[in-house]
Amino acid sequence: STFTGNLADYPEMLRMEKEAVGGSVIHVKKEKGEWKLVLDDTYNRRVDGSTPIELTGPARGTSAVGGATQVFGSLGNCSGGRTLWNTALSCEENTEYGDDYGWPNFTDEHYGWVMEVDPFNAKGPVRKHTALGRFAHENTAMRQTKDGRVVVYMGDDARDQCFYKFISKKTFNPTNREAN
């Protein structure tokens, strides 16, 4: 925290801290051999500590997430991956945030998930997928099984931990991104 002890500074400090975490979707373009940011592009957006994020999967609305169906913010983002339907995944590496930051209404169970954002839909929802588990997510790799289901491999960044594998019940639908 950057809190100095002066309560008058607290709202601005809180805003700045929340804006400094998370990730960004940016449009870059190669011009004359150099990669450049396309300023003011409709696809550019931030996912920070204040962004509303939808919870999906079996923990949504349960006591495991304090009854939440939506949480605010993404923290401790590490690596991620790309889905078969060309959205981006970002992994929240840590699961214990609430008291460490001193942010009101931020509870630990809202962090430690895999987050999905569609870089081609600037107005689309950001989602945290509870079906992929809650732990110190390091990364994801996605593949399709021979019978068409989606497999997500995930590493745990905590010391002496595991490698996880999620297999979907339904098959991958290449013509309907929302069905995946």
Predicted regions span which residues?
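Conserved small-residue
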Residues: 1-180
